[in-house]
Design a protein with these regions (language model features):
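PLP-dependent enzyme catalytic core of the Aspartate aminotransferase-like
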Residues: 328-332, 340-370
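N-terminal secretory signal peptides and thylakoid transit peptides that target proteins
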Residues: 1-15
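Active-site pre-lysine segment of PLP-dependent enzymes
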Residues: 152-159, 174-197, 201-232
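Conserved PLP-binding catalytic core of the aspartate aminotransferase-like
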Residues: 144, 289, 301-332, 351
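PLP-dependent aminotransferase-like
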Residues: 110-168
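N-terminal "arm"/small-domain region of PLP-dependent enzymes with the aminotransferase-like
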Residues: 14-70, 85
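Phosphate-binding glycine-rich loop
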Residues: 78-117, 131
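PLP-dependent aminotransferase class I/II
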Residues: 224-300, 304-307
């Protein structure tokens, strides 16, 4: 019977990494892994890109300090023009926000406050709903199906005269599921005639399904659809807080009135550079794929069921209460995802660097095979 140590030695070559001194880590991994001294534990809990900021973005930020005395309006307008060209829309359709979270919140505030309804799957990313509730919105929760994917048929059935927004996070956080392309297009086409459909595409860059559509195409057709994008994930800029919304101009104009936080000049300039740094973009995607393979290998070894992920995290059936597994892993030096009701025996783990993933694997084996 294969022991834990044997498995570590043989699986994907990671055993050698765990059992060897740090000096033999690959040159690529050493040069791109920068330990964050602020957090004494490995953080696989927030779906961040641990390889960012790219060197090009860091240099752009350094050269942009001279502009720190200026208000960011013109800089943001220039970024909006760059994004409009990238996505094939007008600059009036772009709203620069302080991270995509601000975009979600101000959309909920704009359209659903004071008694409006938001229809949303559950579990999902909660920023829009929790904020809108504070301003008098009601939330109509639709549980995900057995496959952890959205039940779009049920969501559409629940649309009523009081429904103002339908929220989709696609791929979904925390489940990592992806709505089938045709089903997504058909749903947005139909539902957007009755209410505004909001498509959160924070993890869109990680999708590997060929020709998978962004709902920006629905915006271009003039549908009542809003799309959110972020620089926090594949671009590795979570700490800089910059994202954007895309909507037809008349919808964008309503949202723009409620923007609270201006993105600062350094974040805007960093975003401009990130859009041009394809080498780092591809590097991040490649590292994410490799990290997911290692985690899948572990979960298969432990006979733990998981959802095939289209993101930079994996949602798996832990067979333990996450409120117990979380502290146990933290004691091993690894922080994993929080509870996502009602799935208290499921766990979301982010893909960190390969070195971080190997420490996660080591901790999991110690817990599950002790």
């Amino acid at each position: 019977m294969q022991t834990r140590r044997d498995w570590l030695r043989s699986s994907l070559g990671i055993g050698g990494l765990l059992l060897a001194p740090p000096s033999i880590l690959s040159a690529q991994e050493k040069s791109d892994f920068q330990p964050r001294s602020l957090d004494p534990v490995i953080r696989l809990s927030s779906n961040e890109n641990p390889y960012g900021l790219s060197n090009r973005v860091q240099e752009r930020i350094k050269s942009s300090f001279i502009h720190g005395c200026r208000y960011p309006y013109a800089y943001s307008d220039n970024l909006a023009e760059q994004l409009a060209i990238k996505h094939g829309v007008s600059p009036e359709s772009i709203i620069i926000t302080g991270g995509s979270t601000e975009g979600l919140r101000i959309t909920g505030l704009t359209f659903a406050s004071n008694g409006g309804e938001i229809i949303s799957g559950q579990p999902t990313f909660l920023a829009m709903m929790t904020y809108a509730e504070q301003w008098g919105a009601s939330i109509n929760w639709v549980p995900v199906g057995a496959d952890k994917g959205y039940d779009l048929d049920e969501m559409e059935k629940r649309i009523s005269s009081k429904t103002k927004l339908i929220f989709l996070c696609n791929p979904n956080n925390p489940t990592g599921t992806l709505v089938p392309a045709k089903k997504l297009v058909d749903f947005c086409d139909s539902a957007s005639k009755k209410a505004i459909v909001f498509s959160d595409e924070a993890y869109y860059d990680f999708i590997e399904t060929p020709n998978y559509p962004s709902m920006i195409e629905a915006v271009k057709r003039g549908d009542n659809v809003i799309v959110s994008k972020t620089f926090s994930k594949v671009y590795g800029m979570a700490g800089l807080r910059i994202g954007y919304l895309i909507a037809k101009p008349e919808i964008a104009a309503k949202i723009r009135k409620n923007v609270v936080a201006m993105s600062n000049v350094l974040a805007v300039e960093a975003a401009k550079e990130a859009l041009q740094d394809d080498a780092f973009y591809q590097f991040s995607l490649a590292k994410n794929r490799e990290a997911k393979k290692r985690i899948y290998k572990l979960l298969d070894h432990l006979n733990l069921k998981y959802v095939q992920s289209h993101t930079n995290f994996i949602f798996f059936h832990a067979k333990k209460d996450i409120r117990e597994l979380g502290p146990a892993m933290l004691a091993k030096g690894v922080r994993i995802g929080r509870p996502f009701p009602p799935f208290y025996d499921w766990c979301r783990v982010s893909t960190g660097t390969l070195e971080e993933v190997d420490f996660f694997i080591k901790g999991m084996l110690e817990i599950y095979e002790s």
